[in-house]
Amino acid sequence: MNRILLTLLTLTLLAGCQRVAVEETKLVPPAVEKTVLNVGTIYGSQIYVTTGQGEAGFDYEMASRFADHLELELAMKPYSNIKELYQALNSGEVDLIAAGLADTPTRRENFRLGPPLYRVNQVLVYKQGTPQPKDISQLKDEITVITDSSFVDTLSQLQKIYPELVWDQEQDKDNEELLAMIARGEISYTIADSTTFEISRRYMPELRAGLTLKEKQAIVWLLPAQNSDKLMSELLTFWHGEKLDGTLAHLDEKYFAHVKRFDYVDTRAFLRAIDNKLPKYKERFQYYAGDLDWRKLAATAYQESHWNPNARSPTGVRGLMMLTLPTAKQMGIENRLDAEQSIKGGAKYLRGILNRLPDSIPDNQRMWFALASYNIGYGHVEDARKLAESMGLNPSAWRDLKEVLPLLQKRKYYKQTRYGYARGNEAVHYVDNIRRYYDTLVWIDNQNKLLEENQALIEESQLADQIGIGEKAITGAQPE
């Protein structure tokens, strides 16, 4: 009996020992948390530039703020041309493109487009002294544009109306290079957006705008066509916030408003003065500027005296920085006609104004308030700020103050103020002029640095070649 029970128990246990399929557990690595916003861009005055003062540009500033909104670090990645930008976005090298690109049907087919940042016109550009184009159909093969640009889309649409219209495309050049080729007379026509044209003619005053080919075209950011829903949602939320709090309007004023006014004679004279006069005073501007950007100090001096140390005004101001006698005494300046003393006094006075300004004025706008004060007096600027506040405007935003300053010339408004009448309209033009001069100095400074870097590379390459030839001579090898 016991033997039977033992046998049954053994059989039961054996039956329970069937092979069990154990499913292999696959360990899924945790998702890597994103820490950087990679933004593809191209170099351009209003898009993205690197200077001794750091990175700048409309698209850069917006991208920096968007990265802050996402609580990510920003990495700007400049590419050589638009084709490379597209490839980088499609391959995932960058999360979005912020490069001053326009909204076009072709881009809508291939990417997701963000909301409009600002709007531009497309203009046909030619050189002063050559015939002004009257009709696009007459140009035939004389137009050169950038490959993959919005201008190719525009010309393709026009070609349906004018079948004989043809054009050349350049892949390895940017729009500013083509504009420089126009200025040198190397090509006849190109197309540029109105902001790039307006900025570039400050350095190349020979440029002229002919026909307007497209109006009010939106400048947008590009996102991948797939898997970008979350990023697009964040971008739209961010854009609405920036629009409501005035950031978009501020950046538009900062980068574009002051370049719309253009004076060919003044621009040519300034470029000549940079070559002929500035070298005499550059080191002094750099020294006495201290923590200020010396180029803003130099631009102010040019606006005041055209860098003439003996300049005099019927109102009593004198010297390179055109100081009044009381201001000179206050700054410890004995001789206003001495260039070094004048620069020292002007820098000290300007720095003093900056220190007096209310903390509510943002750092990136304080200089414009200070320059307006330098021109018409601190009290009048304070009057304008109070007027702005009474009108429901922001007294600490330059874009609002420049609208109010001209009102100081109207009795209806200046009778409400403490300091009375002032030529506020002149103060606005004064600041705009200095900003244009400053932008030109920055551009030329950057060009000179690029030339120096290229020259250093050439010399390094030549030295390497000489060393290689020397080594071959020592070993007895024949140079190739």
From Swiss-Prot:
UniProt-listed InterPro entries: Lysozyme-like_dom_sf (IPR023346), MltF (IPR023703), Solute-binding_3/MltF_N (IPR001638), Transglycosylase_SLT_dom_1 (IPR008258)
Residue numbers annotated as active site: 304
EC number: 4.2.2.n1
Cited SMART domains: PBPb (SM00062)
Membrane topology note: Peripheral membrane protein
Annotated keywords: Cell outer membrane, Cell wall biogenesis/degradation, Lyase, Membrane, Signal
Main location: membrane
Pfam hit, one: SBP_bac_3
Any one GO molecular-function label of the UniProt entry: peptidoglycan lytic transglycosylase activity
GO biological process, one term: cell wall macromolecule catabolic process
Compartment(s) of residence: Cell outer membrane
Residue numbers spanned by region LT domain: 260-480
Segments for region (Non-LT domain): 16-259
Signal peptide residues on this chain, from the entry's feature table: 1-15
This protein's GO CC annotations: cell outer membrane
Domain notes: The N-terminal domain does not have lytic activity and probably modulates enzymatic activity. The C-terminal domain is the catalytic active domain.
Name of the protein this chain belongs to: Membrane-bound lytic murein transglycosylase F
Organism: Shewanella woodyi (strain ATCC 51908 / MS32)
Record gene name: mltF
